[in-house]
């Protein structure tokens, strides 16, 4: 009979899924969840429930459990600790056997780990703070199409951060005028210009027209400056097929870089595009539109460091990473923590920076973090110091808002950057002497002097939301 040895009924998750004696394996995917149980639910039961519902468990005992070796496939909550300074919040550590996940699929990884469990009634709130991805799993992903070193070699740009600018107004320009703005910024000294993430293919500017005029602008600026230039042509569309069509056209135009919104576009589409980009020599710029829907709340959702790790696996050469200064938030230590996760090959566990696990990226190419959002020339010393050479500093309004126009705005940013890099290389302290360095440079650059005057009082200061 089917019922032999099968005891129906509901039993506590913690009897099966809370295993404090478990020794984690090198091949396990490890997760750190911030758990807020409902009143009356013990933390062990809450942690075990998370492990169960994100792996093999369901709410009742089922007889088909007997047809598999549950011990081999179940997630295990192996450690729980209270969050200091928070009432009724715990960090629950969960280990998942590698066999639960399809190779090379961020989509499947997230569907398993965060797909179902966040609506669970026994929890008041749940946040995924960090993941440890084992080398065995990382090796099943291509990762970024090119990575930091290959990008520098392609662009022939070394020893400094790269400069970008988002073309504004983001919506409403015709393709010809849009291309004109691109040309002016690149001609003035920027390395890149960028489609705003909202720009896809709207009635006032269809994608193909924009691609053609931007390519023309780029080649003209290259011919005049002798530098390699790029414009992030935004490829997302209503279907993946249409997105690939746009990427293919970008390659036919011979431009160096395309762009994707990886969260709104989805990980499956993003990984397909990343594979195409590596096969065809295109760089891939990633925007994180929609991230704050997922990562803004301190006690529920998913921290951006997890989304950043996932992007490195799925594939992208640049990703927006907040600014530390400017209008979009990012606490300094926490931001630098996930910036290292994007760029470095080996990152040590460091709870003071929000890094819960040591992560070995086994030589997967790195991703350039992009600092953008409400930044201008006065921020240049801080940005150069905080983000270092391997970054893209992106000034939208901070270029196009220059009183003399786009090209002088670009000149001001380039002069400010070169001055900061030179000062740093001479051993000066950018944090302390930053304003002085910018002032000195503005004496021989009227464009920079005008920019300094316009933005001398602008600040976006609010208390940070993201604390440890």
Curated annotation (Swiss-Prot):
The prosthetic group or cofactor this protein requires is: Mg(2+)
What EC number(s) does this enzyme carry? 4.1.1.39
Catalytic activity reported = 2 (2R)-3-phosphoglycerate + 2 H(+) = D-ribulose 1,5-bisphosphate + CO2 + H2O; D-ribulose 1,5-bisphosphate + O2 = 2-phosphoglycolate + (2R)-3-phosphoglycerate + 2 H(+)
Query: Which Gene Ontology BP annotations are present?
Result: photorespiration; reductive pentose-phosphate cycle
What interactions and quaternary structure are annotated? Answer: Heterohexadecamer of 8 large chains and 8 small chains.
* Family of the protein in this entry: Belongs to the RuBisCO large chain family. Type I subfamily.
Q: Which NCBIfam families would you find in this protein's record?
A: PRK04208.1
The misc remark on file is: The basic functional RuBisCO is composed of a large chain homodimer in a 'head-to-tail' conformation. In form I RuBisCO this homodimer is arranged in a barrel-like tetramer with the small subunits forming a tetrameric 'cap' on each end of the 'barrel'.
Protein name, as recorded: Ribulose bisphosphate carboxylase large chain
Q: What is the lineage of its organism?
A: Eukaryota, Viridiplantae, Streptophyta, Embryophyta, Tracheophyta
Q: Which gene encodes it?
A: rbcL
